[in-house]
Each structure stands twice: as structure tokens, then as C-alpha cells.
Amino acid sequence: MRLLSFAFIFLLTFTSCAQSRKEKQAAAQTKPTSAPAPDSLAVATFAGGCFWCTEEAAEKLKGVYTVVSGYTGGSTKNPTYEQVSTGLTGHAEAVQISYDPKVVSYETLLEAFFAAHDPTTLNRQGPDEGTQYRSAIFYRTPQEKAQIDAYIKKLNAARAFQAPIVTEVAALKEFYPAEEEHQDFYRHNPNNPYMRAVSTPKVEKFKKKMEGKLKDE
């Protein structure tokens, strides 16, 4: 990733989302088993910067059964984390959410998505810079696209953010699950420097914004 300023160089050396694969593999663990899912689950795909944080935020929502970190939006088939981290594949770090629409609506997922990151910074989230960290929503149906467009229009009209929303809205082509060491990385590595400096503050802020719509902890 490209560093934002010389003042951040030392800090980002230890707190970048793009750490070495070897370091992450050492912390890999199996995703926990959730309660049996109903047959009528729907799926939604979002990109909001480093997927370690995005995954953790989504998993806290009531009605969400599974969240898978992965890559989408680009042209490279079966990309690796190292390839996506170059910013040359066109893929974004994303999450694929399986949810019960009887419990949590697509609009609530949109609300959570915009609460979990800054949708006004182009190709950047916090210290992470590059197209792989862009804000994006990948729709599956014309109805979803219309809902996304209307929601963004509403947020811009209400000036919910200090700058216009730059979130990409695109049709989902193919989602590639990330390597196992990236799944539930936040929960397995609470003392990781990046988690403590970047992800945990974002998740705590998200929890306050989405109070009443989260699972019991």
C-alpha cells in the first residue's frame, strides 16, 4: 500500500492491514460454528476497506448468520491476498453476508455498511490506500441497485457525511473467498497492532451507531 505521509511511516509499518502472509497464517483458526441457518437466507456483498474490520462489524448484526471475507470487483481469477494487495487486480477486499431477511432487512445492511466506514474517501480507508480498499456495494438484482441508489441519494440529501459519498455501485460478477487466515481475523487477533490502532476503534464506533440492532454479546 502507499503510505499517506512521512509522519505515518513508522506507525503504519506495524499497523497496516497488509501484513505478511506468514504472520497471519500463524494466527489462523477455524471459524466458530453458528446456530443452524434457516432455508430462506439471502446474500449481500459489500466492500468498506480492510475486510478484517468489515467482517467483524457485519457479524454483530442480528439476523446475520455467516460473513466471509474475500475479493470481488476485479478481473483476476482466483486472486491471492498478495495479488490483491498490489492494487493491480481490480479487486476490492470485501465481505459476503448470509442473512435472514425476516430478521434484518437489506436496508438495515445498507445502514450498517455506511456506519462501519467512511464512504467519502476515494480508494482509501484510514491508513490503507489503494483501489483494493475502495468503498463499494455489489448488487445482485435491479431491485437491490434501485434500493442502493435511493439510500445513497437520501444520505447525500441529508448531508449525513461532510463530503459526497463516492461508494461504487456495481453488479456482482464473482466473489472469491479469501484465504483461511483472513477469516475472523479480528476475533482471533485482538492484540494485533492494526486491530488495536485501527479496527477496534472503528468497531466500537459502529456498535454505538447500530445500538439495538446487534446480537447480544
Across the structure, where does each feature detected by a protein language model lie?
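Flexible coil/turn and secondary-structure edge motifs
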Residues: 17-217
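Bacterial N-terminal signal peptides
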Residues: 5-15
